[in-house]
Amino acid sequence: MSKFTVINHPLIQHKLRILRDKNTSTKDFRDLVNEIAMLMAYEVSRDMQLEDVEIDTPVAHATVKQLTGKKVAVVPILRAGLGMVDGVVKLIPAARIGHIGMYRDEKTLEPHEYFIKLPEDIEKREVIVVDPMLATGGSAKDAIAALKKRGAKYIKLMVLVAAPEGVKAVQAADPDVDIYAAALDDHLNQNGYIVPGLGDAGDRLFGTK
């Protein structure tokens, strides 16, 4: 079974409260998604490997740490996932960025893939899939399946708000993929929206419906 982590840092929870508010403007919503993603990336990257290296400081010779191991790819699920990319890349500037285009049929709630572009060496990279919402889990499962089909082996899923139904669905389909969220909400309503949630993240990010 994969690990599911809710990141309860006070700054994240405070910003998430503003994000949920229906009166928050498009600009503020966009800024907050970016800020929360950057803060979450600290926890998501906690297990990155380090190695010892020798350097000279202005004062003395020293043994210090630097990152080693796998390179990173950040893969947003379009379109709402785009809002989280800059925050992660600010923290991990060497990361490559892929894209997976998914849309959800509003009647069946089933996801459909319409675009995918990934780094050529995706099989060697640690992939962080980003999407603000984990609702039914359909889009996340399909995105992960598309990544695995193209060789990705090391995948994490980072979302802002998750529903229990979506977490269970992803864990059942992909027990090797760890999930990180800023909040675990109560349930999905009859329209497939997370309750209490934050509405349609894509619409609120881009100011379009």
From Swiss-Prot:
Listed binding positions for uracil are I194, G199, D200, A201
SUPFAM superfamilies registered for this protein in UniProt: PRTase-like
* CDD domains assigned: PRTases_typeI
Keyword check for Nucleotide-binding: yes
Protein activity control:
Allosterically activated by GTP.
**UniProtKB keywords:** Allosteric enzyme, Glycosyltransferase, GTP-binding, Magnesium, Nucleotide-binding, Transferase
Q: What is this protein called?
A: Uracil phosphoribosyltransferase
Q: Which Gene3D superfamilies match?
A: 3.40.50.2020
